[in-house]
Amino acid sequence: MTVNNILWFRHGLRLHDNPSLLEALRNDGTGSESVRLYPIFIFDGESAGTKLVGFNRMKFLLESLADLDRQLREIGGQLYVFKGNAVNVMRRLFEELNIRKLCFEQDCEPIWKARDDAIQNLCRMMDVKCVEKVSHTLWDPQQIIRTNGGIPPLTYQMFLHTVDIIGKPPRPVAAPSFEFVEFGSIPSILAQEVKLQQVRNLSPEDFGIYYEGNPDISHQQWMGGETKALECLGHRLKQEEEAFLGGYFLPTQAKPEFLVPPTSMSAALRFGCLSVRMFYWCVHDLYEKVQANNQYRNPGGQHITGQLIWREYFYTMSVHNPHYAEMEANPICLNIPWYEPKDDSLDRWKEGRTGFPMIDAAMRQLLAEGWLHHILRNITATFLTRGALWISWEAGVQHFLKYLLDADWSVCAGNWMWVSSSAFEKLLDSSSCTSPIALARRLDPKGEYVRRYLPELKNLPTLYVHEPWKAPLDVQKECGCIVGRDYPAPMIDLAAASRANANTMNSIRQKLMERGGSTPPHCRPSDVEEIRNFFWLPEDVVADC
């Protein structure tokens, strides 16, 4: 007898370390039953972040699905990709294919709860076993909350203490064996009804999504898929090993470079092309290997994968908070009276037309590539919110969620709340603020990054490339870049705006403190060092704001 099981891919777009895949390959019977597997993905307008998605994100997703399809075809199967409401598609598959079991990876964020509750209800109604497995996070966020007494840990140090009680995250599960698995096929009439797609032929344009970057900019190309992710992991581990041998860790933060091919694994983690548990354990095992050959062992702990732990923290903080990416209904977010722009201020920030080269280069890189270094994300977010324009972080979240390859709801919103001093910060303490001009001089001393993404400034002398408005008019004419015509003049007096915003923050803070008990349960960092590590704040790029 053969049982029919569905493996529903959502975010975990991989075959390695995939507990839900292993579950789908189990027959749950007497042992004489074989398994017929149907691997599927559903374009329902929301799953995998497709509710708000730009060209590069959709391209990365389609490449990831095509890579899965290619791998499955090599072993006799394929990835069935459908378009439509997930419940409606599943109901027809259950009815026509006599499905015994549905398996999928847990999507812990509350934005997926209604979808998954509806699917689980359908499974109960149609007597289909529904199995959900945790593998998109290192730990189960629900277990973290239970261990912390039923509430999320309100500081990062509390989070570290809680997961220390739980213990180290599970190691990756075994590789799947398809030796005794049959892959099912979809009847043609059903395929037409549930809008079966040929994923190998899909492009962002098929979804009405078009490239918005400057095609003349020379930019990095990112490629989605498990195959590419595992290849990149090998390169990244070499970089990690060099850092460990050199006595430091987090190499992409310790020595940030904006022009070299990026080695970040975050996009692959966001779409689940790479298992976060595999990445975590590869780095930690490598560290132990390097340390075993050292005469004096250096403590590493969770710090060597600090960004992965922050990812877990933000996931945990969001899991019971459906308003996590909003301000007013969000219990952990301070309600700051942000400016509601009636002019083109927000559009100028989005399009890279602020008149501040480092900000503009970053925003144009985002449109061109779907990527920004962690430092550039922080500085552009600070500029939009408390550092300059005083526009709500909610607008920034929506823009980043649409265009950043690796943006997911929890981490993206958490970062924006922190940077804007709305949460995860000392109560409205706006003292730690990066100067985009000082940071540009520090990290792009020759202006190479700015010139790549702002070709109109390519001929300006290095002396003026980060402050083109200071170039004499004859220099501007000679370089073919007149400020105010070929490149915008600064849209604001940055120093004055920063001071005014800091004063406003202090005033709001004072009123909140005077109210005492009405102050929201505001999450905040454990110490000053945590702030500097999060923002990457050398002394010489901190502005007086």
UniProtKB/Swiss-Prot annotation:
Organism this protein belongs to: Aedes aegypti
> What role is this protein assigned?
Blue light-dependent regulator that is the input of the circadian feedback loop. Has no photolyase activity for cyclobutane pyrimidine dimers or 6-4 photoproducts. Regulation of expression by light suggests a role in photoreception for locomotor activity rhythms. Functions, together with per, as a transcriptional repressor required for the oscillation of peripheral circadian clocks and for the correct specification of clock cells. Genes directly activated by the transcription factors Clock (Clk) and cycle (cyc) are repressed by cry.
Q: Where does FAD bind?
A: R236, S264, S266, Q307, H374, D406, A407, D408, C412, N415
**Localization terms from the record:** Cytoplasm; Cytoplasm, Perinuclear region; Nucleus
**Cofactors, names only:** FAD
Q: Which residues form the Photolyase/cryptochrome alpha/beta domain?
A: 3-138
One Gene Ontology cellular component: nucleus
Protein name per UniProt: Cryptochrome-1
Q: Name one GO biological process term.
A: regulation of circadian rhythm
What is said about the domains?
FAD-binding region regulates cry stability, cry-tim interaction, and circadian photosensitivity.
